[in-house]
């Protein structure tokens, strides 16, 4: 059984991903998996450009997450003017500006800091994007719950708040 990730994304951002405008998805957490790994895109509602299927979401495509950047804040926390948001390389502890990441994520510095609430986050890099010709139902996927004995499969009944582990789809 191969492990992948099912990630919930709002229609506005799904449309930007589908049009290749958005190549990084920012999240507060990350999977405990080595890159690269497969991600299935669950669009939380039907967007006009994505087929407008109603109030319930669908899985619209998939991508490979080939890299994850650690987004952190350096400076005096609690004093926004003295804090700088940076990308940190966990191996070397060297930092770099977030400008390129913000552009690729279609975010402003304010949007990023509002979302992360001045905490750390992760930039999931999107590569090998594939948008499905026909959307898929959430029920077609099998979730994986971590237990002390390994991954336990379960039927997904509702979309994850942010993301969850799933089995790689059978038809692949």
What is the role of each PLM region?
Residues 2-172:
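Structured alpha/beta reader/binder surfaces that contact nucleic acids or chromatin modification marks
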